[in-house]
Amino acid sequence: MEPGFWHDKWQSQQIGFHQSDINPFLVKHWESLKLEGKGKVFVPLCGKSLDMEFLAAQGHEVIGSELSALAVSQFFEAAGAKPQSRTQGEHVHHSAQGVTLIEGDFFTLDEELVAGCSGFYDRAALIAWPAEMRIDYVRKLAALIPAGTPGLLITLDYPQEALIGPPFAVSPNWVEEFVGEYFEVVVLESQDVLADNPRFVKKAVPWLNEAAYLLVRK
């Protein structure tokens, strides 16, 4: 899955992975991280997610990583903000209203960019990757996140053969085995969300579970 795949998705606005509302699990479980103060929060593969506005409204400085320049511009446009932009290495930093979106390749991010973050949030990053690439993402995330840092992970799970991702199915067992190699994993909640996802209903996917996990970097 090359960068061009995601650029094409944004250019054609085939962004079914984008949610038009703040994720309910984020609202319900963010406090589970028990963050002290209102520190920085890292959001990998953030797109133009409204979840970042929620995090900023909690007083956090949000640091998002996003490949698509179009996604970045659409986020700030929707927020009615005109970001200040600067180039740092091969990435471009866009900042406004407590949110900084780092435009460029997630896999080439420097650890220093997220070293000061007190928490992280992954709603659409892990599930964006097919199984053969997902482990590389987890390893990079683990390399960026300092030991002891908590995060909220939200996944989807369904019979993968029933639908061509993204989003891809990520089972609880996969999270325990591969994410658990680098993070302490606590299941916060899992529920059937098939009725709320017309694309999956239309494709006759028999079931769809959304799960929230509390992660802590080992």
From Swiss-Prot:
UniProt-listed Enzyme Commission number(s): 2.1.1.67
Keywords: Cytoplasm, Methyltransferase, S-adenosyl-L-methionine, Transferase
Name of the molecule in the record: Thiopurine S-methyltransferase
Catalytic reaction(s) noted: S-adenosyl-L-methionine + a thiopurine = S-adenosyl-L-homocysteine + a thiopurine S-methylether
Binding-site residues, S-adenosyl-L-methionine: W10, L45, E66, R123
UniProt xrefs under PROSITE patterns: SAM_MT_TPMT
InterPro entries: SAM-dependent_MTases_sf, Thiopur_S-MeTfrase_Se/Te_detox, Thiopurine_S-MeTrfase, TPMT
An individual GO BP term: response to metal ion
Lineage: Bacteria, Pseudomonadati, Pseudomonadota, Gammaproteobacteria, Alteromonadales
KW DNA repair (keyword) present: no
Molecular function GO labels: thiopurine S-methyltransferase activity
Natural source organism: Shewanella amazonensis (strain ATCC BAA-1098 / SB2B)
Subcellular location: Cytoplasm
Family: Belongs to the class I-like SAM-binding methyltransferase superfamily. TPMT family.
Highest taxon above the source species: Bacteria
